[in-house]
């Protein structure tokens, strides 16, 4: 009767047991004493069978009522070991659950009604047991231990420590494994939940499957997927879990750790050393500066200035990095002289000799006012370029325009850039973000996104945002910008472009699973193109955040 009508009544006494008991008694009489009801024994057997079928049906209906009442009071403790997590090449396992329908809304509404409070609230003895735990915690510890035991033989055992409301899962009696097709992940996935409800634990489940997929000996090694996890907090449990799964999959040699909080064990990564266009270096650095109000003008100047420095370094055969850029921002004369030497020696070595001779004659009297305090060679170059205005090189011209600024004025307009660069080049972090490729004594690996993707690598990135949010945001966004650049390269040329013919001819389609915990902390201008256009390069983003409002507040829209 309980499931006959549209509106269910599951929060009530299980009256079905009454008719089930009566049916059992009637079946017993018909089977063992048919003469008592004036039945032929043969007919008695048939009547007993009918009563048993009816009684069994009523018992099932009553038991369903009991199950529902127990379900909404006590959420089952569902746990899986790592080996029990199903790994499929078609579907992604999410956990236990059900599709929310109208009946679940009705059931939840019924649970909120005060008339059924006796079925929804814990029993009197349960509440007494919890009170006794608090009261006798120190005086009778054995009693507290007994009452708090999670054994099924404890009738007042506490709820499992899973948090949340048991009503949400309790309104469905028959939960099943919930999966989503892997083909749908290219559209990206957003996981929303408040703090301490299990977002990171869900990330562990999904990352485990991504690491183990195609690692059971049946799949081609080239089908293995890239797994990258950005963790602003630097959760050690997540790091350990990823490493253990990599070992279990036989992929420990493909595992990289980049952790700003533990530079002694961290791999090294140059966030501005790889680029498709040299202008990307300036965008990655200046993108971390504020662009609100009057700061927008300083941000644009910082971009132009860093772009000039990066172009000059590349032309000189140097790899840009944070320390070198910070060095040249504070001493542009050095880079200007180095590039001028390179440029004039290419044009005519005698020109530089002439400039060197003029530099020896420079003094305070013949130095222009805006160049006071500059290196004598800078003054000599200025005089030569003034007299020979037909000589032009875009990089030399950019450096020359920066040098001509009054030094005091120049220091003011780069004032917003220097604090950021100081934070990125202070202490051991500088060794991570500007690796010395010639230091053979440093055995910490150096990685790039191109190398990681080609190796089908696994990367854990801990940004240690609790210690320094600015540095974490700057490094994270630079990594995203580098990844966007790499995605653009893959989209245009494929992953194996530039490799020998036999390798280049192989399929270069690879899935890149990007897991971003505390997504709102990482959200920036660099991340938006990664979401919008990264799917074409195989990037599949799974983002975890507390509320959608956090994302809106972060991007200001």
Feature-to-residue mapping (PLM):
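Conserved ATP-driven motor cores of ASCE-family P-loop NTPases powering translocation/secretion/packaging/pilus
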Residues: 531-557
């Amino acid at each position: 009767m309980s499931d006959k009508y549209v509106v269910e009544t599951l929060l009530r006494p299980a009256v079905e047991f009454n008719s089930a008991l009566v049916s059992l008694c009637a079946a017993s009489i018909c089977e063992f004493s048919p003469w008592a009801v004036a039945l032929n024994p043969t007919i008695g057997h048939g009547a007993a069978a009918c009563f048993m079928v009816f009684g069994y049906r009523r018992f099932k209906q009553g038991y369903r009522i009991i199950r529902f009442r127990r379900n909404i009071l006590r959420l089952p403790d569902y746990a899986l070991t790592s080996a029990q997590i199903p790994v499929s090449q078609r579907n992604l396992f999410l956990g236990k659950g059900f599709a929310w329908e109208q009946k679940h809304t009705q059931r939840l509404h019924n649970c909120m009604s005060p008339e059924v409070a006796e079925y929804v609230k814990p029993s009197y003895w349960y509440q007494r047991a919890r009170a006794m735990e608090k009261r006798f915690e120190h005086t009778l510890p054995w009693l507290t231990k007994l009452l708090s035991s999670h054994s099924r033989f404890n009738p007042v055992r506490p709820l499992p420590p899973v948090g949340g409301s048991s009503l949400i899962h309790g309104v469905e009696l028959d939960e099943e494994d919930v999966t989503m097709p892997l083909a749908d992940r290219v559209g990206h996935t957003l996981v929303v939940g408040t703090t301490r409800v299990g977002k990171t634990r869900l990330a562990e489940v999904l990352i485990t499957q991504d690491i183990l997929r195609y690692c059971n000996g049946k799949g081609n090694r080239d089908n293995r997927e890239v797994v990258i996890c950005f963790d602003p907090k630097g959760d050690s449990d997540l790091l350990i879990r990823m490493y253990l799964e990599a070992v279990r999959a036989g992929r420990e040699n493909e595992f990289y750790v980049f952790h700003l909080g533990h530079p002694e064990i961290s791999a090294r990564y140059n966030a501005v050393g790889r680029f498709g266009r040299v202008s990307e270096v300036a965008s990655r650095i200046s993108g971390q500066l504020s662009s609100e109000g009057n700061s927008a003008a300083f941000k644009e100047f910082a971009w132009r200035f860093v772009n000039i420095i990066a172009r000059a370094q590349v032309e000189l055969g140097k790899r840009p990095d944070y320390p070198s850029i910070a060095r040249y921002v504070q001493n542009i004369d050095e880079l200007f002289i180095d590039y001028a030497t390179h440029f004039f020696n290419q044009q005519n070595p005698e020109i530089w000799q002439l400039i060197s001779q003029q530099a020896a004659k420079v003094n305070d009297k013949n130095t222009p006012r805006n160049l006071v305090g500059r290196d004598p060679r800078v003054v000599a170059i200025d005089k030569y370029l003034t007299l020979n205005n037909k000589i032009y090189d875009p990089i030399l011209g950019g450096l020359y325009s920066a040098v001509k600024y009054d030094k005091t004025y120049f220091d003011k307009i780069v004032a917003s850039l220097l604090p950021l660069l100081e934070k990125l080049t202070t202490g051991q972090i500088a060794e991570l973000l500007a690796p010395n490729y010639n230091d053979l004594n440093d055995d910490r690996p150096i990685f790039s996104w191109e190398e990681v993707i080609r190796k089908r690598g696994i990367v854990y990135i801990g940004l240690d945002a609790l210690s320094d949010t600015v540095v974490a945001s700057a490094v994270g966004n630079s990594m995203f910008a580098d990844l966007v650049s790499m995605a653009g390269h893959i989209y245009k040329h494929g992953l194996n472009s530039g490799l020998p013919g036999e390798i280049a001819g192989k399929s270069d389609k690879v899935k890149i699973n990007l897991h971003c915990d505390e997504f709102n902390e990482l959200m920036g201008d660099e991340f938006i193109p990664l979401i919008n256009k990264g799917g074409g390069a195989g990037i599949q983003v799974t983002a975890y955040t507390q509320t959608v409002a956090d994302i809106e507040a972060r991007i200001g829209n």
